[in-house]
Amino acid sequence: MFVSTGGIDFDKKKPSILLMHGSGLTHIVWSLHEQFYASQGFNILSVDLPGHGNSEGPSLESIEQISNWVKSLMNVLGIKKIIIIGHSQGSLVGIDFASRYPDLISSLVLVAGSYKMPVNQDLINYAEAGDEKAVLLMMKWGYEGSKAFIGGNPVKKIINSSREIREVLAVDLNACNNYKDGKESLEKINCPTLCIFGDLDKMVPLEVGNKMVSMIKNSEKKIINNCGHMIIFEKAFEMRKSVKEFLSK
């Protein structure tokens, strides 16, 4: 299991932030965030889920399994409460975890997330076949219209082999597609929650995001303009500022 700490040693006296990446990705997507949050006095746990990046083993097949894995990680590290910042699929994990383990979470940040993430069947078929078209479709639907990526979209550089598409991305997409408890889970969330959306995101349109926010008690919303699905890259500094203000309350 690989966990990046942002270059700072883990200290049980500090509050801990878990950075949860999205489908097919790795901890690398949080490279503009790890040291920033660490400098604010938090432990950083930027994970590669099993089967992703530097973590061995098969990919976990359901959102519930990933939540249970997070609970096990907390037990190993002796963490009693966690702050979860989840992007895309990572938001589903945050929603599920907060609803099932309310005593283990202090705050939740959902980035480009929704309580349900149905996946286009063509996208799943391409991914299961290890076809690069799966990555191209993700990039088109998530980031079309965004001008943030000079020199190429970084997602393609992370998911860059047919094995990764077939054994990692496809499993993650099916996990998102098969998660059906989102609406009920939202109603069980009690911790302070920040929802961050990009106005150009075609994977999580604003109307879907607004509906989700209305269903979470003690929640607030931040909309980032001229931004697609990959907020953590596209508008990292604006996002970090919003998260810092939220966690300071």
Feature locations, PLM:
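Alpha/beta-hydrolase fold catalytic core
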Residues: 1-18, 39-43, 79-80, 163, ...
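Active-site loop/oxyanion-hole signature of alpha/beta-hydrolase fold enzymes
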Residues: 4-6, 31-39, 43-86, 241
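Active-site glycine-rich loops that stabilize anionic/oxyanionic intermediates
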Residues: 22-25, 88
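Flexible "cap/lid" loop of the alpha/beta hydrolase fold
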Residues: 92-136
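Conserved alpha/beta-hydrolase catalytic His-Asp/Glu region
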Residues: 125-188
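Short beta-strand/loop motif that positions the catalytic acidic residue
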Residues: 189, 195-197, 201
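Catalytic histidine neighborhood in serine/cysteine hydrolases
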Residues: 206, 210-229
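Catalytic histidine-centered segment of alpha/beta-hydrolase-like enzymes
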Residues: 227-240
